[in-house]
Amino acid sequence: MSDINATRLPIWGIGCNPCVGDDVTSVLTRGEALC
């Protein structure tokens, strides 16, 4: 899942939750507001 992390995380903030992998998709939907 490295590709997802390298492609998604930097978009909304890699410093927010670098441990997020499979949940990155869900986090982007709801976590976007949290960050």
Swiss-Prot record:
Tissue-wise expression: Expressed in basidiocarps.
Chain residues in the propeptide? 1-10, 19-35
Modification sites for (3R,4R)-4,5-dihydroxyisoleucine: 11
* Positions where (3R,4S)-4-hydroxyisoleucine occurs in the chain: 11
MF annotations from Gene Ontology: toxin activity
Q: Which residues carry this modification: 4-hydroxyproline?
A: 18
Cross-link annotation 2'-cysteinyl-6'-hydroxytryptophan sulfoxide (Trp-Cys), location:
12-16
Modification after translation, per record: Processed by the macrocyclase-peptidase enzyme POPB to yield a toxic cyclic octapeptide. POPB first removes 10 residues from the N-terminus. Conformational trapping of the remaining peptide forces the enzyme to release this intermediate rather than proceed to macrocyclization. The enzyme rebinds the remaining peptide in a different conformation and catalyzes macrocyclization of the N-terminal 8 residues.
What's one Pfam family the UniProt record gives for this protein?
Answer: Amanitin
Cross-link Cyclopeptide (Ile-Pro) placement: 11-18
Keywords recorded for this protein, A-Z: Hydroxylation, Thioether bond, Toxin
> Highest taxon of the source?
Eukaryota
Q: Tell me the protein family, please.
A: Belongs to the MSDIN fungal toxin family.
Further comment: The typical symptoms of amatoxin poisoning are gastro-intestinal distress beginning 6-12 hours after ingestion, a remission phase lasting 12-24 hours, and progressive loss of liver function culminating in death within 3-5 days. One of the few effective treatments is liver transplantation.
> What does the protein in this record do?
Major toxin belonging to the bicyclic octapeptides amatoxins that acts by binding non-competitively to RNA polymerase II and greatly slowing the elongation of transcripts from target promoters.
Q: What is this protein called?
A: Alpha-amanitin proprotein 1
